[in-house]
């Protein structure tokens, strides 16, 4: 299969949590539009299989692999520096970082488990910080785009999601602050806030769609199309933005018709 376009031609993108779900979709869409992709994850078998699939599909006429799998524990800074180093060694640079890895946890302040709280913050927020810290030295010379995946739980309150919401709000704050700090290097930093998306992580959730004006979950492709835009030069004057992609769920209070 040949490329769909050259919107991110020859850019090098590292995506955390990319072995499956939204991360895998992001990697495939970026590769389809010309990027070299680094699939970073703890899931070795799935990550390597995805890299092989992308290489088989998108190296036609190029004569080399366009995807690389690297083992990554997002809570470990040395793991991050090794992943960035592998990306630069293989492809020569790093242009795009997609901080996609995350976990979804439940619990109010009253009943949340303390260890689970710490684990959620460590993966969903500190993991983003460590990824950015590791990536910036590789991006400083030529600039780049950092895309932090948050959630609508980082835009509004979320009942019974204390740790998850705290982490996702933290991602928004980290994004805005880092956009100010890294702007002089022409490194753009934006956050993406999906609503409910059809992924393995959300497959078991039971919910209605009364609060979503568009009346459905998002497809992973729809989120990936936004990632593609932010990774490309089409968004060259966007930084510090928090972009909701939620079918209108955070647009307002969708009251019952008889209210």
UniProtKB/Swiss-Prot annotation:
Belongs to the short-chain dehydrogenases/reductases (SDR) family. The keyword Oxidoreductase applies. Optimum pH is 8.0 for dehydrogenation and 6.4 for the reverse reaction. It is an enzyme of class 1 (oxidoreductase). The keyword Glycoprotein does not apply. One of its GO terms (molecular function) is oxidoreductase activity. The active site is at 164 (proton acceptor). NAD(+) binds at residues 20, 22, 41, 73-74, 100, 164, 168, 197, 199, 202. Dehydrogenase involved in a cyclohexanecarboxylate (CHCA) degradation pathway. Catalyzes the NAD(+)-dependent dehydrogenation of trans-4-hydroxycyclohexanecarboxylate (trans-4-hydroxyCHCA) to form 4-oxocyclohexanecarboxylate (4-oxoCHCA). Is highly specific for the trans-4-hydroxy derivative and shows only weak activity with cis-4-hydroxyCHCA. Can also catalyze the reverse reaction (4-oxoCHCA reduction) with a higher catalytic efficiency. In the reverse reaction, is highly specific for 4-oxoCHCA and cannot use either the 2-oxo or the 3-oxo homolog as substrate. Cannot use NADP(+). Its EC number is 1.1.1.226. The lineage of its organism: Bacteria, Bacillati, Actinomycetota, Actinomycetes, Micrococcales. It catalyses: trans-4-hydroxycyclohexane-1-carboxylate + NAD(+) = 4-oxocyclohexane-1-carboxylate + NADH + H(+). Induction: Induced by CHCA, trans-4-hydroxyCHCA and 4-oxoCHCA but not by 4-hydroxybenzoate (4-HBA). Strongly inhibited by N-bromosuccinimide. Not inhibited by sulfhydryl reagents, such as iodoacetic acid, iodoacetamide, N-ethylmaleimide and p-hydroxymercuribenzoic acid. Keywords: NAD, Oxidoreductase. Homodimer. Homotetramer. This is Trans-4-hydroxycyclohexanecarboxylate dehydrogenase. Pfam families: adh_short_C2. InterPro entries: NAD(P)-bd_dom_sf, SDR_fam.
